[in-house]
């Protein structure tokens, strides 16, 4: 479907749905081929059907607007130019009347009005029936009139100077007015300058004779004679309303700015109107009958324009070389269709007249029609162009039109002949060119304002001052310097690589890549063969001479060269004409210029360009160098080597440094209630035998650890000045087993014999006295101490293996506690192992690599602290293997669960075996992350006496399992099919079904998978009572690994067996009693559950001496209600009925956390339900 049909469909659709008839009538009718009849019968049948309504009635008669004119838009710019020219000439003439005498104005008034009548007759656009149409009769008449003027001027060269000056002034005013013709909305590009009055006065003074003749072209009232059609494309926009408020000089300066912004040539527009003073003064043998002569002159105006000023090299056009061709330029090229001989004769005539220029004697006017002030006031924005504004222009057919024009210019003569003719012109003009350059060198700005003002280009004066090194004359100019296809740059990147450079900052690597890629893309889009066809003479003209002009013409000719020469490249001409053999720049000069212009790129570590690339620019070679000098990563040290070196360093250090191991005994960094002060004497020391030193130690530390810490202080902080003479040697104090700790007698001496000697494995808080003394032991007692408390380190400094410690004393247990199994596996060994490691709290975690095909060999052991997180295991393993920990995760061995890296090592529940799996594989296997463990309490209670982050000190509650334990092998694939719903109280207590070992073996409950061998360590749940005798049944192994979903309503007690409810299990919690009327609304208390009794007691060791707090004892039968608050998860209440009374006592408590509050309420409710069932 073509565009015409689509547009008519839109018009017809609007006609049908338009609610306003007046607005509907203003829709423009479709194009009617025959304008005289103006009837719908001339329309195409398909288009006529679109304007039929549902009743079959045509909508076209209702339209009041005239039909679309075919040639209206093509000639609309000319109409706007003629209109603006008449208005502005009258306005400028009014401004110039103040500087010119009244006598001269009256003398020229009659001649001016005659010229106005002539220009009115030459109007190319006429209005007929409300439609603007092109009039070919007036066009031919205009051309014949112009040719007659040329013929007359050719015959009479000695006419009066007044008449010649008048012709020049009229063309100058047309130049000024034609600058407005590029845009109908002239106020869009209006610009104000503070110095507009000054520059305007200078321009008036420089062109006094010119402006004087044209001051009365139009009277002042001519500005208001605007005649527009009913449906004008300006949308009734009146320039006069805007311009009346501005000064006259401001308008004059604004006209120059419009032309400077778009880089339009004055002569180019003037010749488009059919009048040029250069041709009037040069061509005396023109043909005034043929219209093609004018068209030929317009099409070759790019070449003619070069010789319009003193024969200087190239005043080709003020179109910037990177500025795309305008619509008018395309019309001039496409109109040229025949009569190429007259083009050649035109060149010959101009060659005869040599420098033929009607303004050769004017020293204050520059070569392209600008005064000196106007040349200095060129806008800095002249090299910019908005790409979106030119999207509607079509540049696809310019290449073919250029080729056609070049072929038409050649005519019946060969290209070489045409070149020879133009070369003769160049010879005649070379001498005048040097003279002109010498006069105007100071006021001509080298290069383009794009490189000067916007990029701060560093140009060399040597490049522009050497006129003798010119290797390119006007005859070798190419048409495609101005008429060029595909020249719209992307985001204003200049297409020419000659005068423009991209200047770099400190870090422009990304910018370089983007610009280089853009330049390569634009250069590769051109075809060199097509470009060589458009060149008249000379394939690669250089920029050494064309750079003397304000507006470069040949800058676009070098765009086919390598982009590595961006901004400063030079080439040598390959023309074969005789005059091209003029003295050229030597190779050394070219090399020096190249070096100076490419210095900036080399400073930024860009690949240097060899000279061969500069010389072979025709071939378009591109040098691309790949950077391969990447930073080589240093090899990381081997883990095994680090272990050996560490061992070596530890061996060479002082043996006293190993006592630093006992520094953890210091009680300065723990709360006061967890530490105690000691006054320590040293019997064998001269300084501390009578004078003790004071320190603070942890209450939970053993006597052996206190001995080691005292020796550490003696060797560091409390070290005497004369250590060698004090009585102890380094070998003595390096081993704590050489000493024992005793209580001091009243006279300051230790008790004799074994009285007062403290047990090495008991805690320091068991003694009631704070004064102790270190005494040396004999060899027999030292040997006994070595067996009882072996050193956790070697004398050389290395830590001993845990298996060595276990082998030393695993054959015997010293606490005499019973061997007992429980539901929970501890994360470290039994209490003997704990005492032997002296609180090191380090466990080994085995990490397997997924898939675990060979578990006997494919594993790595990582040692971490009990308080560390699972993320620490992953980080240590990845650091050891030089892997990225962000790409891996840890999963439970044999389970489809991903461990949460924020959980502690306690989540492993003693099964210290994990698998390393990549996150990609985990996503493919759809592994789920383990849910938070809400069942186990995380705060210190009697029940939760395992090692948690807040309870780091284990009690005597870890026993070894019997060889024939009651733990049966349970398959790992057994799962609980029932999901955790709202479990009833009976099911919580386990009363509905009693579990047995057989049911456990059959898979009624889930297991952790790691207790199948029955040789693990288990937690003794009843650590305060000895009421549990015999073998316990196995219940709910590894609840954290269970597949049951737990909610806050199903805490730790859910799913447990209820035997602890009847066997005197003891639980203790820290709570706060809330009293609203008290001065302090919260008081700390300890809530203890012991069998059937509930105790509310004051906190241990943290009550003030003047507080009188009673201990309240409640039986479970007195409890009326135990309920958790719904609004605050930490709050709960207990209602109790007092004995012998009917009133109810209410207790409101606040637990440490919501989980512990749920645990307390659940235990009390279970205990209350069990008591009521047994006492029905």
From Swiss-Prot:
Residues 638-786 form the CRIM domain. The modification Phosphoserine is found at residues 140, 144, 400, 509, 552. It is found in: Cell membrane; Vacuole membrane. The modification Phosphothreonine is found at residue 510. Autophosphorylated by TORC2. Residues 87-233, 267-378, 405-490, 524-618 are annotated as: Disordered. The modification N-acetylmethionine is found at residue 1. GO terms for molecular function: molecular adaptor activity; phosphatidylinositol-4,5-bisphosphate binding. Residues 103-120 have a biased composition (Basic and acidic residues). GO terms for biological process: establishment or maintenance of actin cytoskeleton polarity; regulation of cell growth; TOR signaling; TORC2 signaling. CDD domains: PH_Avo1. GO terms for cellular component: cytoplasm; plasma membrane; TORC2 complex; vacuolar membrane. Residues 197-217, 481-490, 540-562 have a biased composition (Polar residues). Keywords: Acetylation, Cell membrane, Membrane, Phosphoprotein, Vacuole. It is a peripheral membrane protein. Residues 1065-1169 form the SIN1-type PH domain. Residues 137-146, 283-298, 605-614 have a biased composition (Low complexity). It holds the Pfam family UBL_AVO1. Belongs to the SIN1 family. Component of TORC2, which regulates cell cycle-dependent polarization of the actin-cytoskeleton and cell wall integrity. TORC2 controls polarity of the actin cytoskeleton, which is required for orienting the secretory pathway toward discrete growth sites, via the RHO1/PKC1/MAPK cell integrity pathway. The target of rapamycin complex 2 (TORC2) is composed of at least AVO1, AVO2, BIT61, LST8, TOR2 and TSC11. TORC2 forms a homodimer. Contrary to TORC1, TORC2 does not bind to and is not sensitive to FKBP-rapamycin. AVO1 is required for TORC2 integrity by tethering AVO2 and TSC11 to the complex. Present with 704 molecules/cell in log phase SD medium. This is Target of rapamycin complex 2 subunit AVO1. It comes from Saccharomyces cerevisiae (strain ATCC 204508 / S288c) (Baker's yeast). The gene is AVO1.
């Amino acid at each position: 479907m073509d565009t015409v049909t689509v547009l008519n469909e839109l018009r017809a659709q609007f006609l049908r749905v338009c609610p306003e008839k007046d607005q509907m009538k203003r829709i423009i009718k479709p194009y009617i081929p025959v304008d005289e009849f103006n009837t719908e019968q001339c329309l195409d049948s398909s288009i006529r059907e679109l304007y039929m309504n549902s009743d079959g009635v045509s909508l076209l008669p209702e339209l009041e607007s005239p039909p679309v004119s075919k040639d209206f838009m093509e000639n609309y710019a000319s109409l706007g130019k003629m209109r603006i020219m008449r208005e502005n000439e009258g306005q400028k003439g009014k401004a110039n009347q103040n500087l010119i005498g009244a006598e001269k104005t009256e003398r020229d008034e009659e001649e001016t009005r005659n010229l106005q009548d002539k220009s009115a007759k030459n109007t190319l656009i006429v209005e007929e029936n409300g439609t603007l149409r092109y009039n070919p009769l007036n066009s031919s008449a205009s051309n014949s009139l112009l040719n007659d003027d040329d013929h007359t001027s050719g015959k009479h060269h000695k006419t009066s100077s007044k008449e010649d000056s008048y012709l020049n002034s009229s063309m100058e005013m047309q130049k000024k007015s034609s600058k407005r013709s590029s845009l109908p909305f002239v106020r869009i590009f209006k610009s104000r300058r503070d110095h507009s009055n000054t520059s305007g006065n200078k321009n008036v003074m420089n062109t006094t004779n010119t402006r004087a003749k044209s001051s009365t072209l139009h009277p002042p009232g001519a500005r208001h004679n605007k005649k527009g059609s009913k449906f004008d494309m300006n949308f009734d926009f009146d320039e006069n309303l805007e311009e009346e408020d501005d000064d006259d000089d401001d308008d004059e300066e604004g006209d120059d700015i419009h032309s400077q912004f778009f880089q339009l040539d004055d002569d180019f527009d003037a010749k488009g109107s059919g009048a040029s003073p250069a041709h009037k003064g040069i061509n005396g043998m023109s043909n005034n009958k043929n219209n093609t002569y004018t068209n030929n002159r317009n099409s070759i105006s790019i070449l003619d324009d070069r010789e319009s000023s003193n024969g200087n090299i190239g005043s080709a056009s003020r179109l910037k070389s990177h500025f795309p061709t305008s619509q008018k330029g395309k019309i001039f090229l496409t109109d040229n269709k025949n009569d190429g001989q007259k083009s050649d004769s035109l060149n010959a005539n101009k060659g005869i007249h040599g420098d033929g220029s009607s303004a050769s004697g004017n020293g204050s006017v520059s070569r392209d029609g600008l005064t000196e002030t106007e040349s200095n006031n060129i806008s800095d924005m002249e090299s910019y162009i908005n790409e979106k504004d030119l999207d509607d222009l079509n540049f696809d057919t310019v290449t073919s039109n250029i080729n056609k024009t070049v072929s038409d210019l050649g005519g019946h003569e060969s290209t070489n002949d045409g070149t020879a003719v133009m070369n003769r012109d160049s010879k005649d003009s070379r001498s005048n060119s040097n003279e002109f350059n010498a006069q105007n060198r100071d006021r001509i700005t080298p290069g383009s304002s794009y490189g000067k003002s916007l990029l701060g280009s560093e140009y060399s004066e040597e490049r522009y001052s050497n006129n003798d090194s010119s290797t390119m004359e006007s005859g070798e100019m190419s048409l495609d310097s101005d008429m060029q296809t595909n020249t719209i740059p992307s985001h204003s990147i200049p297409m020419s690589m000659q005068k423009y450079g991209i200047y770099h900052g400190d870090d422009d690597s990304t910018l370089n890549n983007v610009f280089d890629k853009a330049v390569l893309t634009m250069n590769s889009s051109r075809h060199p063969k097509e470009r060589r066809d458009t060149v008249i003479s000379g394939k690669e003209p250089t920029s050494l001479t064309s750079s003397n002009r304000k507006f470069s013409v040949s800058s676009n000719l070098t765009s086919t060269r390598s982009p590595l020469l961006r901004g400063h490249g030079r080439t040598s001409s390959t023309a074969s004409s005789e005059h091209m053999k003029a003295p050229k720049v030597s190779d050394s000069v070219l090399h020096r210029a190249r070096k100076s212009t490419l210095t900036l790129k080399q400073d930024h570590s860009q690949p240097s360009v060899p000279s061969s690339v500069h010389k072979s620019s025709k071939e378009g070679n591109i040098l691309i160098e790949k950077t391969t000098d990447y930073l080589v990563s240093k090899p990381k040290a081997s883990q095994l080597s680090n272990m050996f070196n560490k061992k070596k360093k530890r061996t060479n250090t002082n043996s006293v440094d190993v006592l630093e191991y006992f520094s953890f005994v210091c009680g300065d960094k723990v709360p006061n209630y967890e530490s105690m002060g000691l006054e320590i004497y040293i019997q064998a020391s001269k300084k501390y035998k009578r004078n003790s030193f004071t320190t603070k130690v942890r209450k939970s530390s053993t006597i052996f650890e206190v001995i080691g810490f005292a020796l550490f202080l003696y060797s560091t902080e409390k070290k005497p000045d004369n250590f060698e003479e004090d009585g102890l040697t380094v070998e003595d104090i390096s081993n704590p087993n050489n000493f024992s700790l005793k209580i001091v007698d009243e006279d300051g001496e230790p008790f004799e014999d074994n009285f007062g000697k403290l047990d090495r494995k008991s805690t320091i808080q068991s003694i009631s006295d704070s004064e102790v003394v270190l005494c040396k032991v004999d060899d027999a007692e030292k040997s006994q101490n070595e067996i009882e408390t072996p050193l956790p380190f070697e004398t050389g400094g290395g830590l001993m293996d845990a298996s060595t410690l276990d082998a030393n004393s695993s054959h015997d247990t010293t606490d005499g506690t019973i061997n007992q199994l429980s539901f929970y596996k501890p994360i470290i060994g039994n209490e003997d192992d704990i005492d032997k490691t002296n609180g090191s709290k380090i466990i080994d975690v085995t990490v397997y690599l997924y898939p675990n095909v060979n578990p006997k060999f494919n594993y790595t052991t990582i040692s971490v602290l009990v308080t560390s997180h699972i993320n620490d295991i992953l980080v240590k393993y990845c650091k050891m293997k030089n892997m990225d920990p962000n790409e891996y995760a840890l999963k439970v061995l044999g389970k489809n669960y991903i461990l949460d890296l924020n959980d502690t090592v306690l989540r492993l529940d003693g099964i210290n075996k994990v698998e390393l799996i990549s996150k990609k594989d985990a996503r493919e296997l759809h592994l789920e992350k383990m849910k938070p463990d809400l069942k186990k309490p995380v705060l210190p209670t009697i029940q939760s006496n395992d090692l948690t982050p807040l309870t780091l000190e284990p009690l005597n509650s870890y026993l070894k399992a019997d060889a024939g334990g009651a733990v049966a092998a349970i398959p790992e694939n057994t799962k609980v099919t029932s999901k955790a719903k709202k479990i009833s109280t009976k099911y919580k207590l386990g009363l509905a079904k009693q579990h047995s070992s057989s049911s456990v073996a059959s898979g009624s409950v889930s297991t952790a998978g790691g207790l199948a061998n029955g040789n693990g360590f288990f937690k003794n749940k009843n650590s305060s009572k000895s009421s549990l005798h015999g073998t316990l049944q196995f219940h709910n192994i590894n609840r954290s690994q269970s597949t049951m979903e737990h909610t806050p309503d199903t805490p730790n007690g859910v799913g447990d067996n209820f035997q602890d409810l009847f066997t005197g299990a003891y639980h203790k919690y820290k709570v706060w009693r809330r009293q609203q009327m008290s001065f302090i609304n919260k008081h700390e208390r300890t809530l203890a559950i012991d069998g059937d009794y509930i105790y509310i007691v004051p906190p241990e060791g943290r009550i003030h001496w003047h507080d009188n707090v009673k201990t309240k004892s409640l039986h479970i039968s007195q409890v009326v209600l135990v309920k958790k608050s719904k609004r605050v998860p930490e709050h709960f209440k207990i209602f109790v009925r007092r004995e012998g009374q009917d009133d109810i006592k209410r207790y409101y408590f606040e637990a440490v956390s919501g989980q512990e509050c749920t645990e307390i309420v659940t235990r009390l409710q279970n205990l209350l339900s069990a008591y009521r069932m047994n006492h029905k």
